[in-house]
C-alpha cells in the first residue's frame, strides 16, 4: 500500500507541475495577445501562433502515428515472447496447491505484460516521443510560410538554371521535410529493433531477426524506406554545392561540379539500389546481402564523396587552378555583386590633385559648417555632465542626424533623456516609485556637430527641462515612455501621480494620455499580470483603477523584434522630431539570408544576402509601431508582405516630416564596404591574384589604432549643385596606408540609396587616414603641445579623423578633447586640419582654415565658434577680478560638502543645484589651469 501511495503522490505532483506550467503558458499567451491587440498587430500574432502550433501539432501527430503503427506491428511478436516466457517461472503451483521449484529459475518482467498494458504503453510512448520531437520544428514556421508565399527573383543560377526563389524559399522547405522524414524513419527503425531484441524475438543477435518473418518484413520495409529518403537527400545535396567553400571562391567550383556533383548523382542511384536489395531480401532471407548493400553504400559514399573529390582537387585543379576555376570565379564575382547591390554602385574618377583655395572654402560654406567636430563618445560624457540634470536620467546614446535649422541644412547630434531607475538611491527603489511614479524620461538634448563655446562645450539647440529651444525645432511632447533604456514594466493612470520632471524646489507631475498599454480593468487581468511578471504586489496594491494601463516591452530593441522576429535590425536606432514636436524612433531593418548562390558570406553564420528593406518607426510617447517597405524590389520582403497582409506599408505612406530623416544605414553600408573592397575587381585574373584588393583604413582614437567607422557628413558631390547627406568610407590599397578611393551612400530625396565610388589616380599619392595620423605625431609643434597637456594632469582624447571631400580635393579634420583628472567632462579644445602638405592645430576649425588658406577663408556670416562670447560692460566699469586657483578649489570643496548634505537630507532639487554650481567652478578651475 505504501508503494501505491507514493506512486499516487508522484502522479499528483507531476500533474500539479504540468497544470502550473500550462497555466503559466496560457497566462503569458493571453497577455501577449492583449499586447499585440493594443498595437493593432493581432493578425500577425495569430498568424505566427497558428503557424507555429499548427506545425508542431502536425509533426507531432505524424511522428505519433508512425511510432504507434510500427510499435503495434511488433505487438504480436511481443505477446508471443511473453507467452513463451511463462514456461520459465521460478515457482510453479499445481492443482493440488503444491509448490515446486523450477530447475531454471529467473524472474521475467515480461510476465507482467498484458495485451491492454502493452497497447497503453505503446500509445503513451508514441505520444511522448511525438511531443518531444515536435519541438525540433518550433522555429521552422517562417520557412514553411515562405514556401507557400514565395516570390520570384527573376534571376537563375548558372549551374541548374533554377530561379533564385527556389534556393531562398523552396530548398530550405524541402530540407526541413527531408530532416523530418529521415529522422522519423530512423527513430522508428531503432525503436522497433530494440523491441524485437529486448523481447528475444531475435534471440542470438540482430542477424537472427531475419529468421523471423514478421521482424524481417517489418525492419526491411523501414530500412528500404529510409534509403529511398536518403536518395532524395543526395538530390538536395546537389543544390547545396552552390554554397560550397572548398574551392578558390565561395560557391561550386571545378571539383564540386566535376567530382562531387557526379558523386551525389551516383550515390542517389546507389541508395535506390540498396533499397531495392533490402526489399528483395525479404524473400531471399539473406542477412549478409542486406549488410553488404548497406556497407557498400557507406564505403562508396566515402570514396566518391571525399576521396575522389580530394584526388581531383589535388591532381587536376591545383596544378592549373586559375584556368580550371575561371568560370566559377566569374560566377562568384557576379552573384556576390548582386547579393550586396554592388553592381549598382556608380564608378567615377576623383582627381584629388587640386589644391584648395580660400574661395573654395567660402563657396563650400555648407560643407565646412557641417564638419563633425564632436564624436559621440566624448560628447555623451559631456551631455551627461551638462544635461542629465538628475541622477535618475540617462543619455543612453548619442545619435547623428540632419535638420533644416532656421532654413539652413545642418547636421546635429541628438540624445534622448531617458529614465534609469537603477540610478535611484537605494531607499527610493520602492515598488511604488519603480512601477507607478518614475515611469518615463523627459526631453531631448541637441547640438550642432561643429559649434563650440569658449569653454570647449557644445552649443545647444535644445536643452534643459522643460525643453528650451534656440532654433525653430520645438518639443511639444517631451515624455519618453519608450526608448533604449526602458526595460521594465510600469503602470500608468493610477491613483499615484507620475513624476514628470523636476521643477524648482519641487516636482511636476502628470497623467499618461496615451492608449498603448493593456488595461488592468478586472481582477482576472490583475491576476494574470501578477502571475506573468512574478509580482504579487500587483494583486494587493490599492493604486490601480479600471483606467490603469500596463506598459511593457518598452525597450525598442525588444518591442519591435517582438512583432517581427524574422527581420534583422541595425545596431543603432535614432530619435527624430516631427513637425508637431513629437519624438519618434527610427530603426533600420534588414532582410538577410544565407541562400544566395555563389555569393560570398559576410559573417560567421554564412549570411550572404542583405537588403535594407524596412524602415520602422516607434512613437516615444505612445509606443505605436509602423513598418514601411524601403526596398520594394526585395523578394524576401514581398514574401513577408504576403504572409502578413497589412503589416507593411509602402514608404510613400510615411509622413513627410519623418521621411526627411531616413538615412542610409551604417551596418549595411559597412558590410557593403567590406565586400566592395574585394568585389570592385570584375576581371577573374585580377580577382584571383588579388592584384587590386582594397582594405578599410584605420585611425588613431585615443592612444589606440582602430578600424575606421563609416561616418555621415553633408557635402556637395562633384558635378552636383546642392549639398546632401552622405555616408562615407575611405579605402586603402592592401598593405598600404595611402588612400585609393572613397565610397559614398546618398540619403536625401530621390537619390536615397544610390551609391557612388570615387577612385583616385593610382599614379598620385593621396594621404590615407593613418598617414595623416603619423604626420600629426611627427609635427613638433603639435606633439609638444599634447605632451604639455599630459604633464598638467589632463587626458588628451584624439577624436575621429574625418576625410571630407571638398570640390576636387580632400580636407582632413581631427578634433582634440581635454579631460581633467577631476572632471569626467571632455572639452573640445583644439582642431587639427590637414590639406595637401600643410597641417595645423588651432582652437577652432575657422582659425585652422585661415592659417592654411589665409584670411579669405573666413566664413563671414557666422561668428567663429570656440571664441568666448563678448560681454556687454557699462562704460567705464571694469570686470570683476577672477578668483585664484586656490579660491576656486576652496569653493569647489564647499559646494561638494553642501551637495552631499542635501543628498542625505533627500533634497533632490538642492542637490542638483549644488552639482550645477560645482560644475561651473570646476570648469573655471580647469580653464585657469590651461591658460597658465
From Swiss-Prot:
Subcellular location: Cell membrane
Entry's family note: Belongs to the UPF0182 family.
Membrane topology, as annotated: Multi-pass membrane protein
HAMAP family: UPF0182 (MF_01600)
Gene Ontology, cellular component aspect: extracellular region; plasma membrane
InterPro entries: UPF0182 (IPR005372)
UniProt entry tagged with the keyword Cell membrane: yes
Regions crossing the membrane: 11-31, 53-73, 118-138, 180-200, 209-229, 264-284, 292-312
One Pfam family named in its UniProt record: UPF0182
Region (Disordered): 861-883
Domain of life assignment: Bacteria
Name under which the protein is recorded: UPF0182 protein Dred_1797
KW Transmembrane helix (keyword) present: yes
Keyword terms, alphabetized: Cell membrane, Membrane, Transmembrane, Transmembrane helix
